[in-house]
Amino acid sequence: MKNAFTLLFETIKERKRNPLSESYTNYLFLKGEDKILKKIGEECSEVIIASKNNDKEELVKEMVDVLYHCFVLLVEKNISLEDIMEEVTERNGKLSRVGDRREIDTL
């Protein structure tokens, strides 16, 4: 049985291959990368607001929106879910020390 992420990703790929005129996913593909990136930015802002408001239910919904739009971008850029999973697997379990990370100085 496939997980929800895989099913969503495959549905988005199918919309790219076989567009449906009333599909929001199709609309994003027609508008192109700039529109997709704009939506990712908007949804990330909504994640921040939901988190700052301590609204767990809204935060979950907005995170799903971010993931959906990121999946649309991955399909647009011809990056597979397997590519992402390989990178996650490679990073998983690696020892990472705070000193190995860039300083975050914009806060």
From Swiss-Prot:
Hey, what's the signal peptide range on this chain?
Answer: none
Q: Which GO terms describe its biological process?
A: L-histidine biosynthetic process
Q: Which reaction does it catalyse?
A: 1-(5-phospho-beta-D-ribosyl)-ATP + H2O = 1-(5-phospho-beta-D-ribosyl)-5'-AMP + diphosphate + H(+)
Q: Where in the cell is it found?
A: Cytoplasm
Q: What Gene Ontology terms describe what this protein does at the molecular function level?
A: ATP binding; phosphoribosyl-ATP diphosphatase activity
| One GO cellular component term noted in the UniProt record for this chain | cytoplasm
Primary location: cytoplasm
**Where on the tree of life does the source sit, at the highest rank?**
Bacteria
Annotated keywords: Amino-acid biosynthesis, ATP-binding, Cytoplasm, Histidine biosynthesis, Hydrolase, Nucleotide-binding
Q: In which pathway does it act?
A: Amino-acid biosynthesis; L-histidine biosynthesis; L-histidine from 5-phospho-alpha-D-ribose 1-diphosphate: step 2/9
Q: What is its EC number?
A: 3.6.1.31
PANTHER family referenced in this protein's UniProt entry, alphabetically = HISTIDINE BIOSYNTHESIS BIFUNCTIONAL PROTEIN, HISTIDINE BIOSYNTHESIS BIFUNCTIONAL PROTEIN HISIE
Family under the similarity heading = Belongs to the PRA-PH family.
Q: What is this protein called?
A: Phosphoribosyl-ATP pyrophosphatase
